[in-house]
C-alpha cells in the first residue's frame, strides 16, 4: 500500500480493492456501501451490516484492522449518507485501474475486484481456520454450497490440520502392546 500511484482516483480504487480483500464485499456491494452501513458496537468495533445487492441477503462483517484503517481514512472525508469509497465508472473500468496499480506495484498478474472477494474467502478466512458457516454468513450466501466453491482445501492445509490434530491427540489414545 506504499506504492506511489499516478493519481488520487487510482488510490481510491486500490483502497477499495484492499478493503474488499479484508471484508469479502463484492464490487456491487462496495459500490453502494455508505457510512450509514457501518456500525460501531459496544466494544468500539466496526461492523458492516447490509444486504447483498445480488441476493438481498443480509450479511454482517466485523472490520479487521486493515479494513478499519481504510474505513477511517475515508470516514471524515465524506458525509454519513455518502458512499465510503466514491468509485467512478463501471466494474470493467475499475478492474482496468487495478491493472495500473499492479503494474506500479511490480505485480505480474492483473487483479480484479472478484479476486479481492475470493482472497477474503480463501486466504483471509478459510485458510486461517474460520469455519465455513461463518464465512458463508459474512459473504451473504443463501446456501453453504455456494461458499464451498471457495473451500478447495490444499494439501498444505490438510497437513497443517492433521499435525494440529496429532498434537491434540498426543497421549490420549494408546495402542495395546
Across the structure, where does each feature detected by a protein language model lie?
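Basic, Lys/Arg- and aromatic-enriched nucleic-acid-binding interface segment
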Residues: 1-27, 128
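Conserved tyrosine-mediated DNA breakage-rejoining catalytic core shared by Y-recombinases
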Residues: 2, 23, 32-72
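Short basic/aromatic active-site micro-motif
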Residues: 11-16, 88-91, 108-128
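Exposed loop/turn and edge beta-strand positions of beta-sandwich/beta-sheet ligand-binding modules
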Residues: 13, 44, 57, 79-81, ...
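Active-site-proximal segment of tyrosine recombinases
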Residues: 29-31, 110-112, 121, 129-143, ...
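Catalytic-site neighborhood detector that most strongly recognizes the C-terminal catalytic loop/helix
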Residues: 52-56, 139-164
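C-terminal catalytic core of Y-nucleophile DNA break-rejoin enzymes
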Residues: 53-72, 80-100
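C-terminal secondary-structure termini that scaffold catalytic or DNA-interacting sites
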Residues: 77, 165-177
